[in-house]
């Protein structure tokens, strides 16, 4: 990813750093409108997810997470920006005339060919079942349920690793550090998701953040006591507690939020590390 730095004529351009190569030119038959209802609110209009709201209107790009065009070679025609995710997407022209979007694998360029199936080369961008992959393969866009499409390791720069195969299950290590079991018949895509340097971008100003639909984040220590447990005091005061707390009074550090008795509890061999 090429980071473009502007001439320092204003504070926003002095501090901004954006990608200068990838543009957005979506195909009309692969996009459709979406109604972004709520934006962090529930049916009563109450804020349930803070720091969300506003943002530019978006058109949803239909992404092929299933990769079910078996044994049909496709060619990467364009690499485009997608406002609905931090990873880039590729437009694929298949040999039978069909056109689809997929997640952009790291290192893939325009003109590369990809294919999905059971006996395909272990090559970046190819999709195949876990049972046909050698141990140690770097993968992304991993299925949890057979035929449902990839659900894991889809963010920019995400990569998982196939570390074991035993019986009907395969063991993979996810980007979060979690180690879990998945059916060997589920498919995944070889390689790492592109746009690895997304965290190197600097928006440079608050307005660019608002375009993304992200509202300002205010520290609890500068709020009033009615708004946050850290609030109150004369001038710059400490939080007044032994440990930090959330706006609702729960411990902010170390409290587990995962639901108990979840169906996947027996499939997780090691919980994610922070």
From Swiss-Prot:
From the Swiss-Prot or TrEMBL record, give the protein name. Answer: Large ribosomal subunit protein uL2cz/uL2cy
Naming one, the record's GO cellular component terms include:
mitochondrial large ribosomal subunit
Q: Which PROSITE patterns does its entry note?
A: RIBOSOMAL_L2
User: What is the native source organism of this protein?
Assistant: Aethionema cordifolium
Q: Does the keyword Ribonucleoprotein apply?
A: yes
Its gene is: rpl2-A
Q: Where, subcellularly, is it found?
A: Plastid, Chloroplast
Region annotation Disordered: where it falls in the sequence: 1-25, 224-274
**Family affiliation:** Belongs to the universal ribosomal protein uL2 family.
Q: Which PANTHER family match?
A: LARGE RIBOSOMAL SUBUNIT PROTEIN UL2M (PTHR13691:SF5), RIBOSOMAL PROTEIN L2 (PTHR13691)
Instruction: Identify a single GO molecular function assigned to this protein.
Output: structural constituent of ribosome
How this chain assembles, per its entry, is:
Part of the 50S ribosomal subunit.
| One GO process term, biological-process aspect | mitochondrial translation
